[in-house]
Amino acid sequence: MNLANYFPVLLFILVGIGVGLVPMFLGKILAPSKPDAEKLSPYECGFEAFEDARMKFDVRYYLIAILFILFDLETAFLFPWGVALRDIGWFGYASMVIFLLEFIVGFVYIWKKGALDWE
């Protein structure tokens, strides 16, 4: 077993670590830093970070999270469909068109109901 064969792998790992760490250190060293109380305070979704954990907050955050999950799942279904489109033929194409139409109808419904308005 010749360890010289593993040199490119070691070099690849070292370059990858360097690409990740060098910009961080350069930014830390070269970037201007003028911290004040406002910049050092934690920001969490527009609320004070150190309040009661059981405080009420707007239900629209839940709605946006649910909508994000739904459209994220739609994207998760679209990728394998696009990869296998040649193999599944017209039936697969038609079923995905129906799937997308259902999502479009649902999106238009929540849009018309005003669920996306942040007023």
Curated annotation (Swiss-Prot):
It is a multi-pass membrane protein. The chain crosses the membrane at residues 7-27, 63-83, 88-108. Coiled coil: none annotated. It is found in: Cell membrane. InterPro entries: NAD(P)H_OxRDtase_bac/plastid, NADH_UbQ/plastoQ_OxRdtase_su3, NDAH_ubi_oxred_su3_sf. The keyword Translocase applies. Its EC number is 7.1.1.-. The keyword Transit peptide does not apply. NDH-1 is composed of 14 different subunits. Subunits NuoA, H, J, K, L, M, N constitute the membrane sector of the complex. PANTHER family: NADH-UBIQUINONE OXIDOREDUCTASE CHAIN 3. This is NADH-quinone oxidoreductase subunit A. It comes from Polynucleobacter asymbioticus (strain DSM 18221 / CIP 109841 / QLW-P1DMWA-1).
